[in-house]
Amino acid sequence: MPKARVYELAKELGVDSKTVLSKLEAMGEFVKSASSTVEPPVARKLRNAFASSGQGNASDSKKPGHTAKKPAEPASHSMPKPAAPSAPKPAAPAAPKPRHAASKSDAPKPGHRAPRPGESRQHGNRPNGNAPRPQGGDRRQSGRPTAVPGARPQHGNAPQGGNNANGAKPHTPGPRPGNNPFSRKQGMHTPTPGDIPRPHPMNRPSVNNGEGRRGGRPGQGGGQRGGFRGRPGQGGAKPGQWGQHRPGQGGGQRPAGGGNRFGGNGGGFQGGNSAPSNGPARGGRGRGGAAGAFGRQGGKSSKARKNRLAKRQEFQEMKAPVIGGVRIPTGNGQEVRLRQGASLADLAEKINVNPAALVTVLFHLGEMATATQSLDEATFQILGEEIGWNIKIVSAEEEDKELLQQFDINLDEEELQEDGDLKPRPPVVTVMGHVDHGKTRLLDTIRRTNVIEGEAGGITQRIGAYQVTVNLEGEPRKITFLDTPGHEAFTAMRARGAELTDVAILVVAADDGVMPQTVEAINHAQAAHVPIVVAVNKIDKPGANPDKVRGQLTEYGLVPEEYGGNTMFVDISAKQGTNVDKLLEAVLLTADAELDLRANPDMDARGATVEARLDKGRGAVATVLVQSGTLHIGDAIVAGTSYGRVRAMLDENGNHMQEAGPSTPVQVLGLTSVPTAGDLFLVASDDRTARQIAEKRQATERAAQLAKRRKVVSLESLKEQFAKSEVDMLNIVIKGDSSGSVEALEDSLMKIEVSDEVGIQVIHRGVGAITQNDVNLATVDKAVIIGFNVRPNRQVADLAEREGVEIKYYSIIYKAIEDIEASLKGMLKPEYEEVVTSHSEIREIFRSSKFGNIAGVMVQDGEVKRGTKCRILRNGIATVNDLEISSLRRFKDDVTSVKEGYEAGINLGTFNDIEIGDIIETFEMQEIERK
């Protein structure tokens, strides 16, 4: 059914549009103007409201293709009182007459079975024209009879209309269109004033709250079809009780041949409801009207119905402010929590709006983004201020804590432990300092092993974790050591080591003194509130000056005890092993004096990943430091985005362990992937929980990376960005032997800045050998593969050679940085400068019909070459630039060049504007090196 507009309804009801708008507003329906459309249920309510108030001309709704009929007036104001009821009795089929008043006797009698909805077509006969009419007086209303709402046709086994059971006040019938959609008057019977019946009330058995028979199936109306007899026992309803009927119940009686064009009742309402003038129609789901003459569905579409929630939401949207052409419900300062890397779709789900509306608002604010694109915090803040929501981006720590709380895991559980459950644990000591100041040599001396020979260039490329036993006053004490790199590329790894440690040993060479990485190590330790023990190393070397080191460190807040401070200094020689035992005693004394190192070994293990790598035979191998609890073989663990079950545990010497207590470093086997160095690990209740936590972290990490990479495109800078040439990117695939080395190499490469014209993009990073997938990825993206302490097998190397993929191998990190920086400089677009090669004076002009003007010149300096660029200088002013020497002759011979002091003939192609005395200056564009 097409939607009616407000001015059409006003014209139909006989009132002005302002009255209709006021009425709609009073009904709770907010319409903008007289040209706005109104839903069919709302139009029906409007007609009922005008009919009940006696204002306007209430008429039935119009079916598609029907013209509006003159509305009926309530008969209760002028109709005579019906006669006394008479006993119901069967009557012969009634002849086609105008509609009669409905009566309760239309319902089936007790003991009679109500016919099924489909029986009317099979058993219904044409009405008999000899049936008597109900008694009633004649009356005129506005020159034509009025329709009687609620009246139903007389049926073969129903009591006659003259025997009404109660004092119903019927309406006089009005004409209805025929069943033929091509003729409006087929089957029409226009009654005369004498034909208007006067109904008589009669008793009606089996009445339920005054309601008539239940409606037929959807699309089948209660009114009788034109030319067919109604079903036996089909009841009507009392006028004034239409508000109690469901949609789909029968409507009024219809004369023979006067059925609705689309079937259903004569009221014209979908679902079989007529439009009474004395009661509002109820909503809800009914059985609908008849299917119509040509099988069209007469019932109301379920999509067109609106429940209260939809109307309330529509009302709220109408009150919402309009931004960029869309309505967004204002938040009034309410807080919305979003994770890092969230998209507009995530925000739309939180505030219950359409994501497309937020895209439009963001575009209105000058930024373009898709609904699923990750946005940064600044963009969300701008959007939140515009729509009235306080958008708060949850930090990674808070988000991870909320994630674990979903699985009943409390990270603050250890703080709630009772003192009786806590037991002493060994201190975790980090060895920090500048590169090549002897950190690894010191650990080598402590552990009595030789690990420095395995490090490329004598530089530690990864974090090592070891545990040693020290005798302090005859009592064995354990100390856990972490070795952090000293190279400047490993800033993140030093910071991570400071976060895991309890006491820091700062190694400073006595001959070098304080260096840049020494200051950085001090800052990391002080930021983590870690006590520092200074080891002044290399005191056995010539030129060593420990007092100079003490004086330099005083400037950074490390005052020795002999100077009145609280920092312990120990002069050692890691190579000779001098005073190493005193250094260990100083570490234990500092830990006992300043720290309360206790943990609960009976809880589930928690800790941090120190380093991780991919072993060819054992898979992912992670070195973890247990900080609290005890880790057992068979525990389900999750470390960052990796998860698995502990299959084996090894100590630093390769010995198998069954459990690992607090402050114990251990190698764990059994993870499905290689975790990142620094990821926290914890024990989950089962494998399923560990997998779900890891997968949720993977999704969060990916969204955060997308938000970090997102380039903000604003409308102001869009034209400028289009004008600029695209930046040439060097795509890189990084593979390394450990996660710490890969992380450090990536961070160092991303810091390289050569020019705005070139850049680096790491498209993939991973731990382990170079695989075929890496080569395929590099082939597609035209990338360079960097292998850090890893090599491909023969098949992968052959594939890379066939595909033309370059693989570079490095074992020292700064060598890789230098090569990549040189490659970026080679990618720069070349710059050119102009170099003048010769000057030639025109002394004669020869005119040729074939070649034009030919200049006879004398080469004054340099060398004139054919095909070079040139310009004309006249009185020292360049008249024409970007000419080309198309022909060069020496007498009658074509030559390629003419040197200084010789005469030549020069033709400049189609350019003939030359004069005697002009100078022809030749030049070349030579490429210069970019720096």
From Swiss-Prot:
<feature type="compositionally biased region" description="Gly residues">
    <location>
        <begin position="217"/>
        <end position="238"/>
    </location>
</feature>
<dbReference type="InterPro" id="IPR015760">
    <property type="entry name" value="TIF_IF2"/>
</dbReference>
<protein>
    <recommendedName>
        <fullName>Translation initiation factor IF-2</fullName>
    </recommendedName>
</protein>
<feature type="region of interest" description="G1">
    <location>
        <begin position="433"/>
        <end position="440"/>
    </location>
</feature>
<dbReference type="Pfam" id="PF04760">
    <property type="entry name" value="IF2_N"/>
</dbReference>
<dbReference type="GO" id="GO:0003743">
    <property type="term" value="F:translation initiation factor activity"/>
</dbReference>
<feature type="region of interest" description="G4">
    <location>
        <begin position="537"/>
        <end position="540"/>
    </location>
</feature>
<dbReference type="GO" id="GO:0003924">
    <property type="term" value="F:GTPase activity"/>
</dbReference>
<keyword id="KW-0963">Cytoplasm</keyword>
<dbReference type="GO" id="GO:0005525">
    <property type="term" value="F:GTP binding"/>
</dbReference>
<feature type="binding site">
    <location>
        <begin position="483"/>
        <end position="487"/>
    </location>
    <ligand>
        <name>GTP</name>
    </ligand>
</feature>
<dbReference type="Pfam" id="PF03144">
    <property type="entry name" value="GTP_EFTU_D2"/>
</dbReference>
<feature type="region of interest" description="G3">
    <location>
        <begin position="483"/>
        <end position="486"/>
    </location>
</feature>
<dbReference type="InterPro" id="IPR053905">
    <property type="entry name" value="EF-G-like_DII"/>
</dbReference>
<keyword id="KW-0396">Initiation factor</keyword>
<dbReference type="InterPro" id="IPR006847">
    <property type="entry name" value="IF2_N"/>
</dbReference>
<dbReference type="Pfam" id="PF22042">
    <property type="entry name" value="EF-G_D2"/>
</dbReference>
<dbReference type="GO" id="GO:0005829">
    <property type="term" value="C:cytosol"/>
</dbReference>
<dbReference type="InterPro" id="IPR044145">
    <property type="entry name" value="IF2_II"/>
</dbReference>
<feature type="compositionally biased region" description="Pro residues">
    <location>
        <begin position="82"/>
        <end position="96"/>
    </location>
</feature>
<comment type="function">
    <text>One of the essential components for the initiation of protein synthesis. Protects formylmethionyl-tRNA from spontaneous hydrolysis and promotes its binding to the 30S ribosomal subunits. Also involved in the hydrolysis of GTP during the formation of the 70S ribosomal complex.</text>
</comment>
<dbReference type="InterPro" id="IPR027417">
    <property type="entry name" value="P-loop_NTPase"/>
</dbReference>
<feature type="region of interest" description="G2">
    <location>
        <begin position="458"/>
        <end position="462"/>
    </location>
</feature>
<dbReference type="InterPro" id="IPR023115">
    <property type="entry name" value="TIF_IF2_dom3"/>
</dbReference>
<feature type="binding site">
    <location>
        <begin position="433"/>
        <end position="440"/>
    </location>
    <ligand>
        <name>GTP</name>
    </ligand>
</feature>
<dbReference type="InterPro" id="IPR036925">
    <property type="entry name" value="TIF_IF2_dom3_sf"/>
</dbReference>
<comment type="similarity">
    <text>Belongs to the TRAFAC class translation factor GTPase superfamily. Classic translation factor GTPase family. IF-2 subfamily.</text>
</comment>
<dbReference type="Pfam" id="PF00009">
    <property type="entry name" value="GTP_EFTU"/>
</dbReference>
<dbReference type="InterPro" id="IPR005225">
    <property type="entry name" value="Small_GTP-bd"/>
</dbReference>
<feature type="compositionally biased region" description="Gly residues">
    <location>
        <begin position="281"/>
        <end position="298"/>
    </location>
</feature>
<feature type="compositionally biased region" description="Polar residues">
    <location>
        <begin position="50"/>
        <end position="59"/>
    </location>
</feature>
<feature type="binding site">
    <location>
        <begin position="537"/>
        <end position="540"/>
    </location>
    <ligand>
        <name>GTP</name>
    </ligand>
</feature>
<feature type="compositionally biased region" description="Low complexity">
    <location>
        <begin position="156"/>
        <end position="168"/>
    </location>
</feature>
<feature type="region of interest" description="G5">
    <location>
        <begin position="573"/>
        <end position="575"/>
    </location>
</feature>
<feature type="compositionally biased region" description="Gly residues">
    <location>
        <begin position="248"/>
        <end position="271"/>
    </location>
</feature>
<dbReference type="InterPro" id="IPR000178">
    <property type="entry name" value="TF_IF2_bacterial-like"/>
</dbReference>
<keyword id="KW-0342">GTP-binding</keyword>
<dbReference type="Pfam" id="PF11987">
    <property type="entry name" value="IF-2"/>
</dbReference>
<dbReference type="InterPro" id="IPR000795">
    <property type="entry name" value="T_Tr_GTP-bd_dom"/>
</dbReference>
<dbReference type="InterPro" id="IPR009000">
    <property type="entry name" value="Transl_B-barrel_sf"/>
</dbReference>
<feature type="region of interest" description="Disordered">
    <location>
        <begin position="32"/>
        <end position="310"/>
    </location>
</feature>
<dbReference type="InterPro" id="IPR004161">
    <property type="entry name" value="EFTu-like_2"/>
</dbReference>
